[in-house]
Amino acid sequence: MARNMNILTLFAVLLGSASAVYHPPSWTAWIAPKPWTAWKVPPPAWTAWKAHPPAWTAWKATPKPWTAWKAPPPAWTAWKATPKPWTAWKAPPPTWTAWKATPKPWTAWKAPPPVWTAWKATPKPRTAWKAPPPTWTAWKAAPKPWTAWKATPKPWTAWKAPPPAWTAWKATPKPWTAWKATPKPWTAWKATPKPWTAWKATPKPWTVWKATPKPWTAWKAPPPAWTAWKATPKPWTAWKAPPPAWTAWKATPKPWTAWKAPPPAWTAWKATPKPWTAWKATPKPWTAWKATPKPWTAWKATPKPWTAWRATPPPTWTAWHGHGYGGYGKPGKPGKPGSKGPRGPAGPPGATGKTGRTGATGKRGPPGYPGKPGVPGRNGYVHIVFDGYGKWEIGKIERKNIREAVAKAWTAWNAGHGHGWTAWTAPPAYG
């Protein structure tokens, strides 16, 4: 099994190296230097701002008043150093020490039998079978084609560096550092007791009103005309279907289908017979050995002379156990985990909780992604896009304004995401 896995791993590595070396022309062209390389370098102001201010460095270096408080008190240190009266009580009794030093009758019984020792010393037939095949050993020692590729500098190393403007901005001090250090006026206000604390604890008159049924419950239900209208088919269902041009394009064969197909060399290799197929089909020498009865099977089934000895403790053990020093035995093996107990009865229903307060307004969400272009309409296109800040922009756009509207939506999306990709790729063209 291990040999098969080694061979499969070899072909997986070879296939992975081949796929890593080959790139289509579009990939090679894209690897060229990008216009956003300089933009990604952090400005010097940022690099300087990230550094610790001198006040912080000096504060860290000054001794703190709580260092002495954290040290243990002298009384504890002195108590730890004094000898304890229970040290002698914890020592094992002399009878236990003498018993441990005497040879035990079961020492010889625990030794493995001579036939086992001899069998362990003989060479096994599976030793040679477990060694890796010579082809694998030679392949492991041969130089690999991807070693040189890994050692060459890559063109994207410089692209990953942050831009200088970002580094400079990081290094400049920020105006909010001092504001954070000043005490705030609301700190004291938060600590004072509030007048509404007692009001919240008193029962409210609207608690009973909330529990009574309201006359407008039936009024809120949708009218039957609305329910019937929802169930009838709508004339715009067919209008929402994709245009025939899209359906026809989806049905035509694409030029990249052949590019995605596996290379002929891989297909041919898969079809050729493999050398390990015959090896798997041949009978193995250990199959017969596994089927033959073993000499230790009968030995395991016969009663052992030490079974009775284990059941009856010797008198010396019983007498010694009366000393009360039984805590010096070896720790027992951990017990097996217990089975799962029966399911307990259901608890009483909990009390109805109070209505929670209205939550605070949430933070602005992340920028949205551009929507897909709408299907054709009577006045050109109904174009639905994101404006780059998580809001929908829906409206009818004339055909002559399609390109301008899409370009604006694309630029807004780039600005909302903070990426400078406008120079890298042009907005999609519609109309």
Curated annotation (Swiss-Prot):
GO cellular component labels: extracellular region
Region (Disordered): 322-377
Ranges: B- repeats: 61-70, 81-90, 101-110, 121-130, 141-150, 151-160, 171-180, 181-190, 191-200, 201-210, 211-220, 231-240, 251-260, 271-280, 281-290, 291-300, 301-310
Compositional bias of kind Gly residues: 323-332
Record field: compositional bias (Low complexity): 336-366
List of glycosylated residues: 46, 49, 56, 59, 66, 69, 76, 79, 86, 89, 96, 99, 106, 109, 116, 119, 129, 136, 139, 146, 149, 156, 159, 166, 169, 176, 179, 186, 189, 196, 199, 206, 209, 216, 219, 226, 229, 236, 239, 246, 249, 256, 259, 266, 269, 276, 279, 286, 289, 296, 299, 306, 309
Top-level taxon: Eukaryota
Subcellular location: Secreted
Keywords in alphabetical order: Glycoprotein, Hydroxylation, Repeat, Secreted, Signal
UniProt A- repeat ranges: 41-50, 51-60, 71-80, 91-100, 111-120, 131-140, 161-170, 221-230, 241-250, 261-270
Pfam families on file: Collagen
Modification 4-hydroxyproline, positions: 33, 65, 72-74, 85, 92-94, 105, 112-114, 125, 132-134, 145, 155, 162-164, 175, 185, 195, 205, 215, 222-224, 235, 242-244, 255, 262-264, 275, 285, 295, 305, 367, 370, 376
Signal sequence segment: 1-20
7'-hydroxytryptophan: residues bearing it: 46, 49, 56, 59, 69, 76, 79, 89, 96, 99, 109, 116, 119, 129, 136, 139, 149, 159, 166, 169, 179, 189, 199, 209, 219, 226, 229, 239, 246, 249, 259, 266, 269, 279, 289, 299, 309
Region (13 X 10 AA A-P-P-P-A-W-T-A-W-K): 41-270
Residue ranges annotated for the Collagen-like domain, each copy included: 329-380
Region 27 X 10 AA A-T-P-K-P-W-T-A-W-K: start-end pairs: 61-310
Tissue: Produced by the byssal gland.
Positions where 3',4'-dihydroxyphenylalanine occurs in the chain: Y22
UniProt comment concerning the protein's domains: Almost exclusively composed of repeats of the decapeptides APPPAWTAWK and ATPKPWTAWK.
PANTHER family, per the entry: COLLAGEN, CUTICLE COLLAGEN DPY-2
Function text: Provides adhesiveness to the mussel's foot. Mussels produce one of the strongest water insoluble glues. The mussel's adhesive is a bundle of threads, called a byssus, formed by a fibrous collagenous core coated with adhesive proteins.
Entry protein name: Foot protein 1 variant 2
Phylogenetic placement of the source organism: Eukaryota, Metazoa, Spiralia, Lophotrochozoa, Mollusca
Annotated gene: fp-1
